[in-house]
From Swiss-Prot:
Membrane topology recorded in Swiss-Prot or TrEMBL: Single-pass type I membrane protein
Residues covered by the LDL-receptor class A domain: 165-201, 214-255, 374-411, 412-449, 450-486
Underlying gene: LRP12
Subunit annotation: May interact with RACK1, ZFYVE9 and NMRK2.
Sorted UniProt keywords: Coated pit, Disulfide bond, Endocytosis, Glycoprotein, Membrane, Receptor, Repeat, Signal, Transmembrane, Transmembrane helix
Residue ranges, annotated region (Disordered): 623-678, 693-723, 748-770, 802-823
Species: Pongo abelii (Sumatran orangutan)
Coiled coil: none
An annotated Gene Ontology molecular function: integrin binding
GO BP annotation list: cell adhesion; endocytosis; integrin activation; lymphocyte migration into lymphoid organs; neuron migration; neuron projection development
Disulfide bond annotation, renumbered to this chain: C47-C76, C103-C122, C166-C178, C173-C191, C185-C200, C215-C232, C222-C245, C239-C254, C259-C285, C375-C388, C382-C401, C395-C410, C413-C426, C420-C439, C433-C448, C451-C463, C458-C476, C470-C485
Family: Belongs to the LDLR family.
Functional note: Probable receptor, which may be involved in the internalization of lipophilic molecules and/or signal transduction. May act as a tumor suppressor.
GO CC term, one of those recorded: plasma membrane
Protein's name according to its UniProt entry: Low-density lipoprotein receptor-related protein 12
Amino acid sequence: MARRWSTKESPRWRSALLLLFLAGVYGNGALAEHSENVHISGVSTACGETPEQIRAPSGIITSPGWPSEYPAKINCSWFIRANPGEIITISFQDFDIQGSRRCNLDWLTIETYKNIESYRACGSTIPPPYISSQDHIWIRFHSDDNISRKGFRLAYFSGKSEEPNCACDQFRCGNGKCIPEAWKCNNMDECGDSSDEEICAKEANPPTAAAFQPCAYNQFQCLSRFTKVYTCLPESLKCDGNIDCLDLGDEIDCDVPTCGQWLKYFYGTFNSPNYPDFYPPGSNCTWLIDTGDHRKVILRFTDFKLDGTGYGDYVKIYDGLEENPHKLLRVLTAFDSHAPLTVVSSSGQIRVHFCADKVNAARGFNATYQVDGFCLPWEIPCGGNWGCYTEQQRCDGYWHCPNGRDEINCTMCQKEEFPCSRNGVCYPRSDRCNYQNHCPNGSDEKNCFFCQPGNFHCKNNRCVFESWVCDSQDDCGDGSDEENCPVIVPTRVITAAVIGSLICGLLLVIALGCTCKLYSLRMFERRSFETQLSRVEAELLRREAPPSYGQLIAQGLIPPVEDFPVCSPNQASVLENLRLAVRSQLGFTSVRLPMAGRSSNIWNRIFNFARSRHSGSLALVSADGDEVVPSQSTSREPERNHTHRSLFSVESDDTDTENERRDMAGASGGVAAPLPQKVPPTTAVEATVGACASSSTQSTRGGHADNGRDVTSVEPPSVSPARHQLTSALSRMTQGLRWVRFTLGRSSSVSQNQSPLRQLDNGVSGREDDDDVEMLIPISDGSSDFDVNDCSRPLLDLASDQGQGLRQPYNATNPGVRPSNRDGPCERCGIVHTAQIPDTCLEVTLKNETSDDEALLLC
């Protein structure tokens, strides 16, 4: 009664197989991309940092360890992408996750947009089907560290929302959508309009009572899977391994038949129970293959058909004899129902485990194994190490040998040509696997072990152009052409980057140029204005202002102008100017000199002073006797003119006396004497001696003429007047030169201790273009009160006794009389004493004056 299925499938059934489903992993939940030959990893890649990419049109996804408990504290994610314009439908087949009120402990989410949750489920109730609105979805599974359950198992299918035609193993919904045939009448609305469940209600209506007929004692009632009506079957069909009832009533609660064996040969074959008939529900078989050789074992499934209803049936293949999840090579399910399937081990041992649920059954599988390099007795070697093929595979248009030996030299084709199929169409070797179909059925591009030059060999034995590799498009169908691609920047990006860098560089140069220009303008503006000195610079450059003339007099550093001593009224101005000239040369007074003439000698400075007509002062030494000298009294002009003339006279005393008489006569109203000739003195000594002698004579005679008083004249010594005058002049000149030499020597050693006048001279800046030096010294009004006999003092010491009124003349013979003030550098210490002279310095001064001025007392 049971219907037997043919061992060979028709071409129509083969072409109508379910669209290359992706196999789910039993125990580990690992997934792999589906193609004609699918390799599934033993360890899931979904439970990691990145989601597992799935591109197959359909498949099964299970939680890690299903149907056993899933691990604690895991996070798994899957990303399913369909073709553009398609939608994805998910149908849950088993679901058992720890439940909570808001599903915040263990949960499963489905998202159309990343990180935007649209579906969350937990608990033990199977969720309703999920239909996406986009061509991609994210599936995420999370578990905490508490309770673990069995997990979930779901199937997905992708297709367009409306198809004109569906495959023979698919069901067309009322809205035009196609779903797998197995989803019909499963109490799940995968169509979206419940059209896949409406027809089931009509078919499930039990027949009327009249349709039932009583069965004999050795029979049982069964809803035939073939006629779909209740019938009576003999008891012998129960638990025979063959399903006769639609509801599997004849094979439920039966003992599982013993299956599986230990295979120890280099080659062999095995199959599922009752093959090619349906295997019994609940079958659990294991085959251990141990060839005793270290070489690889090649396992081929020539026929494979499993049931996918309920929990699903599966076949697991392990590398080795132990059931080690880490050595899992492949998991085959109902979605791998195509042949041939090939699995290669890494050693000479393989473990094959087959498990079926008790819900439904299918035809099963047929498999062969052999050591790498050996062929089965009924196979023909391909040559070398290229494998084997059978006689049925000869000239069938499909390459079973990598070198094409099973398809070469066929009767319908010429030499070195290969048939497209058994219809007589052939093609040359150069057209094989070049990604260009020359056969109507495309057999020249199938099962390509090698590709023509310029093509890339995909993992699913397809060939694509090399230029299509790493172009961000899946051309192989399994994504192998986009794996391990280097990060190559497109030419457009490089061009844009170069142009952008050039523009940025140009802008940078312009910015730098503008910055430099602004900086130069800023610095130019800063140089155009005077900036204030910093505090440190101001402290370094700050100099103390020199004291005023009044402060110097008040402090006693310099004497008043009235204190300069003179021998006669006519001689006062000349002697004062001469003393100041010598003092300025020695550094004791402030005289402003031009820069070019400061290195001149002392005598050029003395005789090069010009008279200033605007200052009211006297020139130092004038060679012009007729020059008018301003004064406060007109009676003093003849005396001063006479003094000027006598400074330049080098004649005898008689000549001087005669000249004095002329001057006196002219002064008293007589006839004016002729002007004397301008004879310049030969030396400064003669000028100095002449000035002293003339001043003495003028003072004596002027006293008789003006005052009318009798003055006792001093008798000259026995020596001749000329010799006495020369001796006195030489003595005074010697003393002056000795004073100058001493002062010059002391000035170099006490340069750091200069007088205030010298400091004043250094601190005052004058005009560099002044050629003349003026010495503004007022003329004393008390010249008539001076003692005419006080001309015996040294030349450089004449102003020491000048005071506010009449002062006692200095007498060298009376050392008890101490002058109150003394100008000029001290002979002992080299310092100018403008106030009281110390006793130590006074003793040395008195001693020198006593010894040096004895010859000068003749005046």
